[in-house]
């Protein structure tokens, strides 16, 4: 039987590193984590892209303040939307189904084959140009969509996956399934981020545990996966996202002054310290 030839999509050939962001269930803040990972990398002067493949809940346009922007069609495919950074070096580009919908309230009611076709098109038909990092925001859970993503990326040799959890036991149980999925499809586990770990008071900035704490860290240790850090709920970050359209200063410039930026700078450093070689070597 002839061996199947796996070809890397041409659209990904100028990208040094590809990282998937996964979660075992919805509502854990995966898209927020993906956005902040992208901004923290861009703050280092790196060229970053974010591909939003969460087809039924495409929230990245709103997260980066680019709602209403249009995706252009170029000779080499769709051209992602550039997010203003206010920096001389680095960039942040975003592609999402949200840019293709007429209204944020439009629902995406598609059967599996149509979702699979859209995932394939997003991976193979978006022209990113040269990037240091491409972050892929995936749907929650494990489904046919995840299998399609894994199949489309086989020839691309992604760096691996970051898994987002919250401290509660029900979320941690779902993360175990995500870890098993990654191992079955040969995605390297770059680490676990425990999101919503505490609440930052908007008045005194004290962080208080409102859920259990340490569930993600314990699971990472138990599973032999790096633990990248804990992220609290910060109302100031939510306010920054919601009010950015009325401000002239670029989102990334605002983000560098937020209390969450140092946390994500450390998380990014933990990933970089793993020393994963460039795909382009």
Swiss-Prot record:
Q: Where does this protein hold ATP? A: 24-31
List the GO terms this entry assigns under cellular component, sorted alphabetically: cytosol
Alphabetically ordered keywords of this record: 4Fe-4S, ATP-binding, Cytoplasm, Iron, Iron-sulfur, Metal-binding, Nucleotide-binding
Per its Swiss-Prot or TrEMBL entry, what cofactor is needed? Answer: [4Fe-4S] cluster
Highest rank taxon of the organism: Eukaryota
InterPro entries the UniProt entry points to: Mrp-like_CS (IPR000808), Mrp/NBP35_ATP-bd (IPR019591), NUBP2/Cfd1_eukaryotes (IPR028600), P-loop_NTPase (IPR027417), YlxH/NBP35 (IPR033756)
Binding positions ([4Fe-4S] cluster): 201, 204
Annotated SUPFAM superfamilies: P-loop containing nucleoside triphosphate hydrolases (SSF52540)
Q: Which GO terms describe its molecular function?
A: 4 iron, 4 sulfur cluster binding; ATP binding; ATP-dependent FeS chaperone activity; iron-sulfur cluster binding; metal ion binding
Gene3D superfamilies annotated for this entry? P-loop containing nucleotide triphosphate hydrolases
Does Magnesium count among this protein's keywords? no
Localization: Cytoplasm
Q: Does the record carry Iron-sulfur as a key word?
A: yes
Task: Give the function comment from the record.
Answer: Component of the cytosolic iron-sulfur (Fe/S) protein assembly (CIA) machinery. Required for maturation of extramitochondrial Fe-S proteins. The NBP35-CFD1 heterotetramer forms a Fe-S scaffold complex, mediating the de novo assembly of an Fe-S cluster and its transfer to target apoproteins. Required for biogenesis and export of both ribosomal subunits, which may reflect a role in assembly of the Fe/S clusters in RLI1, a protein which performs rRNA processing and ribosome export.
This protein's name: Cytosolic Fe-S cluster assembly factor CFD1
Q: Which organism is it from?
A: Eremothecium gossypii (strain ATCC 10895 / CBS 109.51 / FGSC 9923 / NRRL Y-1056) (Yeast)
């Amino acid at each position: 039987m002839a061996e199947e030839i796996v070809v890397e999509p041409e659209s990904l050939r100028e990208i040094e590193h590809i990282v998937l962001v996964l979660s075992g269930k919805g509502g854990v803040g995966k898209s927020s984590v993906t956005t902040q990972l992208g901004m923290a990398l861009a703050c280092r002067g790196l060229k970053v892209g974010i591909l939003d493949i969460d087809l039924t809940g495409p929230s990245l346009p709103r997260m980066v303040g680019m709602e209403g922007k249009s995706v252009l069609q170029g000779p080499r495919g769709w051209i992602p939307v550039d997010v203003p950074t206010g920096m001389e070096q680095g960039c942040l580009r975003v592609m999402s189904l949200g840019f293709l919908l007429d209204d944020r309230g439009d629902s995406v009611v598609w059967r599996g084959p149509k979702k699979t076709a859209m995932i394939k098109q997003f991976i193979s038909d978006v022209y990113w140009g040269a990037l240091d990092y491409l972050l892929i925001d995936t749907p929650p859970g494990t489904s046919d969509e995840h299998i399609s993503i894994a199949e489309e990326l086989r020839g691309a040799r992604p760096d691996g996956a970051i898994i987002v959890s919250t401290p509660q036991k029900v979320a941690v149980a779902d993360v175990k399934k995500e870890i098993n999925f990654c191992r079955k499809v040969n995605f390297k586990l770059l680490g676990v981020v425990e999101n919503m770990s505490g609440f930052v008071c908007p008045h005194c900035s004290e962080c208080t545990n409102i859920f259990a704490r340490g569930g993600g860290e314990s699971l990472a240790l138990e599973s032999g996966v790096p633990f990248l850090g804990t992220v609290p709920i910060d109302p100031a970050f939510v306010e920054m996202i919601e009010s950015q359209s009325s401000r002239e200063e670029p989102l990334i410039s605002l983000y560098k002054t937020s209390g969450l930026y140092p946390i994500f700078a450390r998380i990014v450093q933990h990933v970089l310290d793993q020393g994963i070689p460039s795909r382009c070597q």
